Amino acid sequence: MEIGFCGPGLMGAPMIRHLLRAGHTVHVWNRTRAKAEALVADGARVVDTPRELAARCEAVLLCVADAAAVEETVFGASGLLGADPAVSDRLRWIVDHSSIPPAATRAFAQRAAALTAVRAVGSVDGGAGVGESAGIGEDAGTGDSAGAGAVRNAGADPYTDARKNTEASANPNPFESAAPGSISWIDAPVSGGVAGATAGTLAVMAGGAAADVEAVKPLLGAYASRVTHMGDVGAGQTAKLCNQTIVTATLAAIAEAVSLAQRSGLDASRLTEGLAGGWADSVLLQTFVPRMTQTGLAPIGALRTFQKDIDTVAATAYETGTPMPVSSTVQQLLRLGAAMGLGEADLSAFIDVLQTPRGVPTR
């Protein structure tokens, strides 16, 4: 299968390698070309613009920094759906692994729907585009953290009946769920970090039409051990915000516990053994207590990324009228950490944020 991937960073690079090992042809684009070229030895094919991916690939996966990067990658002049969406006749699925606000995701889905509606009309009316004739699992020619898509996300949609007829028809290819000519956008943020991406055990929280999520599950299964359909477009991003809320609050509490242990004269490194098997035990406890009590370990994740996500949590809480006093405190800890120059450190840096203002020696 022809796959495009935008964003071969710390998470994206191992995901691409899993796709290649699964037998897919993967075309890679990145703003910094060297990061894409580093994957050539693994079998990836590098392209100069996202536009090339839309012309060659049936599915394009995004794993970029933020909503602005998603917008530029998809809707920019050289983006997937840039100057002329009709050029992307092969493209059927945009799967966004980036972590961005749910509202931005829904807006991007609606925008993509408007841009590709003309193409969808042509296909439903009998136009013979490549997107109509070549399914996601078929050989169609060339080589390498929004919403559901042209037909699925246009709101009041004159092509709904045609879509239903298409999906109701018998089709032995499980990937062929998109209506002819449409592009479906699935928001699919992930959890599991670089370790999960490397091991191929990521958890994917997906938002979009159920048929589309089911269609891309075999693809995502190359690097995910679980893909859960959370609901309509934007639901995956909302689930990711819940995930980040729990992770950051838990790690802030663990940092407080480590600090309390140290100031009380206890060897805090023994907390992993002493609390193992009890209610306080968790993957986060076992992973981060050693990182809070040792030095010289390579970071896993970046504080600045969590700051971005918790800022989104705060904005979403405001929009929905949701009281989140714990997350508000965590947000301030993250901001303080960034101001201390710890933006590239992982969340074990919470211990430094808590101890430095009190004059306690840091690690």
Predicted stretch roles:
Residues 199-207, 228, 232-264, 275-287, ...:
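Active-site-proximal catalytic alpha-helix in oxidoreductases
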Residues 60-77, 98-105:
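Beta-loop-alpha module in the N-terminal Rossmann-like domain of NAD(P)-dependent dehydrogenases
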Residues 340-363:
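NAD(P)-dependent dehydrogenase/reductase Rossmann-like domain
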Residues 233, 237, 281-343, 363:
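Interdomain hinge/lid region at the active-site interface
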Residues 1-62, 88, 92-93, 97-98, ...:
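NAD(P)+-binding Rossmann beta1-loop-alpha1 motif at the extreme N-terminus of oxidoreductases
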Residues 73, 99-131, 135, 144, ...:
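Rossmann-fold dinucleotide-binding core
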Residues 15-16, 35, 108, 219, ...:
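Hydrophobic residues within alpha-helices
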